[in-house]
Amino acid sequence: MQFLTAVSPQSSSTPSWKIETKYSTRVLTGNWTEERRKFIKATEKTPQTIYRKEYVPFPGHRPDQISRWYSKRTVEGLPYKYLITHHQEPSQRYLISTYDDHYNRHNYHPGLPELRTWNRHKLLWLPEKADFPLLGPPTNYGLYEQLKQKWLPPPEATLRESIYTSSYPRPPAGAMSRREHAIPVPPPRLQPVPHF
């Protein structure tokens, strides 16, 4: 096996008067900026993407529908009926909010004992108040119905009113001050008005 050693182009034996600059073959000459931007298509082989190389298609393969179904079920979560229904109680019976329970009803709940016990196995105070929601109609003091009656026009009204017109109704006629006029009296220096 023969090893080649790189020889310096200007060795120490070269006289100084023969020293000439050596140019590289990779010197950029001519229209190198324009030629650099030209697209040269690889004719020997079309370049392959990573996806095409690593993921080979299988023509007879069918997707696994069962795993798709399980993943879809996991992403969607529980259906609406399992989230809203509680002990098969109708949803309009337990719409009392926690705020209303704490501040207006003062934690009054007839179904729960006054003192809860500590469960050492579950590490919880039982019974939990969240498991036994307050049953009853929602407390909404009629504000929603009042605003709904104000916002929605009566069914017999066909003309659409603007928000300004509906917000500022016309006051009744009795609220306005009546304009009263004095009886005109002619000045005395003029001729008297003839009477017939």
Swiss-Prot record:
Transmembrane segments: none
Broad class of where this protein is predominantly found: cytoplasm
The species this protein was found in: Bos taurus
Region feature (Mn 2): 96-108
InterPro entries: CFAP107, CFAP68/107
Biased composition (Pro residues): 184-196
Tissue distribution of the protein: Expressed in trachea multiciliated cells.
Subcellular localization(s) per the UniProt record: Cytoplasm, Cytoskeleton, Cilium axoneme; Cytoplasm, Cytoskeleton, Flagellum axoneme
Keyword vocabulary terms for this entry: Cell projection, Cilium, Cytoplasm, Cytoskeleton, Flagellum
Function text: Microtubule inner protein (MIP) part of the dynein-decorated doublet microtubules (DMTs) in cilia axoneme, which is required for motile cilia beating.
Oligomer and partners: Microtubule inner protein component of sperm flagellar doublet microtubules.
Region Disordered: start-end pairs: 168-196
GO cellular component, one term: axonemal A tubule inner sheath
The protein's name: Cilia- and flagella-associated protein 107
Keyword Cytoplasm: yes
GO BP annotations, alphabetical order: flagellated sperm motility
Stretches for region Mn 1: 46-61
